Swiss-Prot record:
Organism: Francisella tularensis subsp. holarctica (strain LVS)
Cofactor(s) it depends on: Mg(2+)
Gene giving rise to this polypeptide: rnc
This protein's name: Ribonuclease 3
GO terms under cellular component: cytoplasm
Active site, renumbered: 44, 114
CDD domains referenced in this protein's UniProt entry, alphabetically: DSRM_RNAse_III_family, RIBOc
Amino acid sequence: MVPEYSRFYNILGYNFKDYTLLIRALTHRSKTKKNYERLEFLGDSVLSFVIAEVLYKQFTDLAEGKLSQLRSKLVKGTTLAQLASSLKMDEYIILGASEQGGHKREKILEDVFEAVIGAIYLDSDFATVKKVILKWYQPIISSINLDTIKVKDSKSKLQEILLQNALSLPEYSIETIDGKDHEQQFTVVAVSKDLNLRVKAQGTSRKKAEQKTAEKMIEMLSQQGLHEKK
């Protein structure tokens, strides 16, 4: 065990046989060409399968569409960033000079989380990495309440509200992109011609900005008495 990583191994609940895999998983592309991107690709697939399997077995009455939405919520975005932070991954991320301070950025935390999973898989086997993933996710999965959880993303929910009321779908477009490459802010506009509505919101990616725009439009529709029909 490499001394400086012994604490991290304890937090992860896994001891690397080849610690260079862990180093690669923690290294951002701003530092070197030997970075975490390939491991991130692998870890993304491993994580998606493990979570899909546990959801399939645990929620036997849930339809395919709902399972997909729930899996998406668990393997993307804020969930991964929060898990990465809880496992102290942000304290070990290796960044180049151009990315200093980026160890708290959500996108980097998401990527590193997936890369570490890819590294554990290569360092061991599928059964081992599955066990580690389920340990990390256990508090989240055990607390899932299908009666209250929002498994539908905002764009999907908005689409259903509009279709249920025989209204055309909104058109999304990027208004502006501000900031440096690693700190971009996207401003997205959504237009509903049938309702004569124009809404805009910002996010650190186009996808996030579109979701926030959809959330705003849902709120406006709610004020007009338009809700999703159960």
